[in-house]
Amino acid sequence: MPFPANKTKLVCTIGPASDSLQMLENIIRAGMNVARLNFSHGDFDSHKKTIANIRAASRNTGKRVAIMADLPGPKMRIGEIADEPIALTPDDSFTLTTQEIIGDANRVSVSFSQLPEAVKPGDKLFLNDGYVELEVTQVDATEVHCKVIVGGHLRSRKGLNLPGIDLGISAFTDHDHECLKFAMENGVDAVGQSFVETGADIEALRQAAEGLGHDPFIIAKIERAGARKHLTGILQAADGIMIARGDLGVEIPIEQIAVAQKNLMRQANLMGKPVITATQMLESMTTNRRPTRAEATDVANAILDGTDCVMLSGESAMGNYPLESVAMLARIAAAIEPHRAAYSVKQIFQTRWEGDHILLHDIIATSVESTLNRITPASVIVPTHSGTTARSIARFKLPVWITAVSSSEKTCQDLMFSYGIWSVHEPDHPDDWKSWSLKWLKSQEVSGDLVVLTEGPSAKHPHRNNRMEIIDLGRQVE
């Protein structure tokens, strides 16, 4: 039986705690499907070694793993701090400067050179994912003087957020282009674009990748308030989204995050685009062997709401328990998935189809979903070139695995981001998919009485009809 216990895909950020070959093999066996490299940290040499280790660990374990490069984008950060962490106390004076200095408890540098022009007295600034709040009191040519409103500890290179202030900067920076070029040259499968505002930001990234001769799977990170207003355009341009709750939770009131998360998932599910839910999912496991009850519930609710992936950040990158964190995600997912209520995408489709163009892969997807309301097959086998039909079916979050068979290795890697899809690379693209399915099921010792098979036109068989077949394994002759 090749299928794991959990259908939710696990994305793990790789860092000093997890970048060794042995640890990578361990967390792959524990359930990691996608390895995330945060290009806001580290250098190209270290990332190159990590990529090589991930590929080697994937080969050694015999398990498919996709690699995602998370581009920094125009993220504003403070600079280096001596004797960190520093402690900021309410009513303290604290200065942000565009000068390159080593920071201390009174002053730190910032990466955004236009900060003094962008803010004015009375504006609120946030550091370290909103844990530290400042109010601007005075602005000079190179310095922004502030009063500490909410204090806390601060370390080097933590983020700076300016909610509600239009900075007029592109989401795809020159440094992003350098990172993209490196990632493509080193065989990275997917790219995460930070601080996306509109679909045009994704198009700029895609055009840059095409200029380099590549077509990566592109994840739009939703972490700005403005992105929610342009979500349809972003989803049309991107291959999937990440709900990056750290920066998003600073950009919008924190009490609105839960509803925003649900709405983002619903829209992405409708459009058949995979969703990654990220930030602080098991934050306490950075230092503790077990998560809090609230964290376990957070992961569970994201799965119940329709996420395709759940993601670890510091827990797996620099925490004390990277392996235990991955195993815990897998445990929670396996326990929660059987309790997921039927997702209501079908009713949404039926509303949308009134007067609109009907897409064939939507019809196939709803037919498969309706069939699985009556039977429980061993798997749904979907031959696919681009992965579109498989993702269209996967949005229903079915109770059985979808076996997506493709002649494209890229498609197999892309499908690692989709809930409940098991990718199989079949370079020859057989003439008889029914015979292939029976042989594959037997070779993998997949148990069950029934299998659902979908077929459609292909480059080899352009006139083949779209159809769905239920195969009774008990009636097949050897």
Task: Identify the role of each PLM range.
Residues M1-E478:
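Non-catalytic helical/linker scaffolds that mediate oligomerization, partner binding
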